[in-house]
Amino acid sequence: MPANARSNAVLTTESKVTIRGQTTIPAPVREALKLKPGLDSIHYEILPGGQVFMCRLGDEQEDHTMNAFLRFLDADIQNNPQKTRPFDIQQGKKLVAGMDVNIDDEIGDDE
């Protein structure tokens, strides 16, 4: 454990920083912050002494563009229900056939 670690921590965990400066947020941290992959954002505060405070952005940090898009979709579905079709799972499987996805892999420059 680092010498400057907080003594009142409930749990400690670590992650490695990639050559691109990225890291995977450890599962216990994601669970503690109730992070939803692809939806939530994280706020960082750099404190004196080189420590960093990290927390999940709350609802006050809404994504207004995404919310506007979702309202548009909702209105379109309500106003044009005849255009709404069920998702064809077989077609979806064809679209992703042969794709190998590992959520623990690093994200490459071309992705």
Curated annotation (Swiss-Prot):
InterPro entries, alphabetized: PrlF_antitoxin, SpoVT-AbrB_dom, SpoVT-AbrB_sf
Family matches, as Gene3D superfamilies: 2.10.260.10
All residue ranges annotated as the SpoVT-AbrB domain in the record: 12-59
Location relative to the cell: Cytoplasm
Disulphides: none
Sample GO molecular function, one term: toxin sequestering activity
A GO cellular-component term linked to this record: cytoplasm
GO biological process: regulation of cell growth
Keywords attached to this entry: Cytoplasm, DNA-binding, Repressor, Toxin-antitoxin system, Transcription, Transcription regulation
Principal place of residence: cytoplasm
Phenotype reported upon loss of the gene: Deletion of the prlF-yhaV operon has no effect on virulence in mouse infection; the disrupted strain is as virulent as wild-type.
Keyword Repressor: yes
Its biological purpose: Antitoxin component of a type II toxin-antitoxin (TA) system. Labile antitoxin that binds to the YhaV toxin and neutralizes its ribonuclease activity. Also acts as a transcription factor. The YhaV/PrlF complex binds the prlF-yhaV operon, probably negatively regulating its expression.
Complex and partners: Homodimer; forms a complex with YhaV with stoichiometry PrlF(2)-YhaV(4), possibly as a YhaV(2)-PrlF(2)-YhaV(2) complex like the MazFE complex.
Protein name: Antitoxin PrlF
Organism of this sequence: Escherichia coli O6:H1 (strain CFT073 / ATCC 700928 / UPEC)
Lineage of the species this protein comes from: Bacteria, Pseudomonadati, Pseudomonadota, Gammaproteobacteria, Enterobacterales
